[in-house]
Amino acid sequence: GPGRPGWHLECSAMSKKLLGNEFDIHGGGIDLIFPHHENEIAQSRCANDTEVFANFWIHNAFITMSNEKMAKSQGNILKIKDFRKKMSGQIIRLALMSAHYRQPLDWNDKLLIDCENTLDKWYRIKLDNFKPVKVSDEILKPIYDDLNTPGYIANLHGSVSYTHLRAHETREY
């Protein structure tokens, strides 16, 4: 009958065109679980005659500023392209990984300074005759546990510090 497609259908159509009838990971904000993702699943499974639309769903919490959700309507959004003019993408990525994806992340200057300092420390250690080492399964373990990036970063801190200390213990002066 008369009408227009809803936004759920737009996403199903884009997913099918770009990723196929079934794909591995579908993501979005926690605010999209219902009704958007539920409708996407229902119509995609029916249209494609499949049991599965996406194998894994990742619903992230919000990035906030001063504990307020970023939103265009509130005028408090930050654009990555603007940040890239001020700092490296590595700092931005480390900042985004500093909180579990299902936990809110408050975006602020302290967070960015801490991430910049962490990266500087890692780079200094690498430049200080640091030899690459294989990342152990123990260090990676948090990643396999619901993409626990803060746990992985903590393990990486410990590993980098320990490896750096060991390198200095065996060095001749």
Kindly label every feature range from the protein language model.
Residues 105-107, 111-161:
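Helix-loop elements that line ligand-binding/catalytic pockets
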Residues 1-130:
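Alpha-helical recognition segments enriched in aromatics with Gly/Pro capping
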